[in-house]
Amino acid sequence: MISRTIRILGIDPGLRRTGWGVIDVEGNRLIFVACGTVESRESLPLSERLLAIHEGLVRVVSEHRPLEAAVEQTFVNKDGAGTLKLGQARGVAMLVPAMSGISVAEYAPNLVKKTVVGAGHADKNQIQVMLKILLPKAAPPTPDAADALAIAITHAHHRQSAMLLRKVAAL
């Protein structure tokens, strides 16, 4: 049986830095494609910062042509204004792939950590160690790019689990 290659874009939304990571999935094999960070200057008005994120992610989608995307969910914290701004960046991160007809999944940060490291409260160093094992050719330039790759890996794992469950249910 020939397995189809699925290209997945993982996005770690942030107003200062939005990480992105692209992987290919062939069966149960993960292949690193690219990763990086879209940055916006704090000195700019919010609308221009959101536009910078939008334009950067449009370039990523256009260049790498993912078939599926995944975005990290955010939680409300003590800084309500900061949470709202992060939510706006997250909205842009979900909108860009959706505008290209790409389905967008969402994953909680603890689920990403549990999927990649095996512990829901893993730290960034543990994530980077596992990324080196799972994607040896990846060298994320920022922690945000590393997180985005972890989000893409989480989506790859959960989509395969869902496919297996559908096959078992059909028996």
Swiss-Prot record:
EC numbers, comma separated: 3.1.21.10
Pfam families associated with the record: RuvC
GO cellular component: cytoplasm; Holliday junction resolvase complex
Residues the entry annotates as binding Mg(2+) 1: 12, 144
Primary location group: cytoplasm
Cell compartments where the protein resides: Cytoplasm
InterPro entries per record: RNaseH-like_sf, RNaseH_sf, X-over_junc_endoDNase_Mg_BS, X-over_junc_endoDNase_RuvC
GO molecular function: crossover junction DNA endonuclease activity; DNA binding; magnesium ion binding
Binding site for Mg(2+) 2: 72
GO biological process, one term: DNA recombination
Active site: 12, 72, 144
Range of residues in the leader sequence: none
Listed CDD domains: RuvC (cd16962)
Coiled-coil regions listed in the entry: none
Cofactor binding remark: Binds 2 Mg(2+) ion per subunit.
PROSITE patterns for the chain: RUVC
Keywords: Cytoplasm, DNA damage, DNA recombination, DNA repair, DNA-binding, Endonuclease, Hydrolase, Magnesium, Metal-binding, Nuclease
Cofactor(s) recorded in Swiss-Prot or TrEMBL: Mg(2+)
Record field: catalytic activity: Endonucleolytic cleavage at a junction such as a reciprocal single-stranded crossover between two homologous DNA duplexes (Holliday junction)
PANTHER family, alphabetized: CROSSOVER JUNCTION ENDODEOXYRIBONUCLEASE RUVC
Binding partners and assembly: Homodimer which binds Holliday junction (HJ) DNA. The HJ becomes 2-fold symmetrical on binding to RuvC with unstacked arms; it has a different conformation from HJ DNA in complex with RuvA. In the full resolvosome a probable DNA-RuvA(4)-RuvB(12)-RuvC(2) complex forms which resolves the HJ.
Family: Belongs to the RuvC family.
Its biological purpose: The RuvA-RuvB-RuvC complex processes Holliday junction (HJ) DNA during genetic recombination and DNA repair. Endonuclease that resolves HJ intermediates. Cleaves cruciform DNA by making single-stranded nicks across the HJ at symmetrical positions within the homologous arms, yielding a 5'-phosphate and a 3'-hydroxyl group; requires a central core of homology in the junction. The consensus cleavage sequence is 5'-(A/T)TT(C/G)-3'. Cleavage occurs on the 3'-side of the TT dinucleotide at the point of strand exchange.
Protein name, entry field: Crossover junction endodeoxyribonuclease RuvC
UniProt lineage: Bacteria, Pseudomonadati, Pseudomonadota, Alphaproteobacteria, Hyphomicrobiales
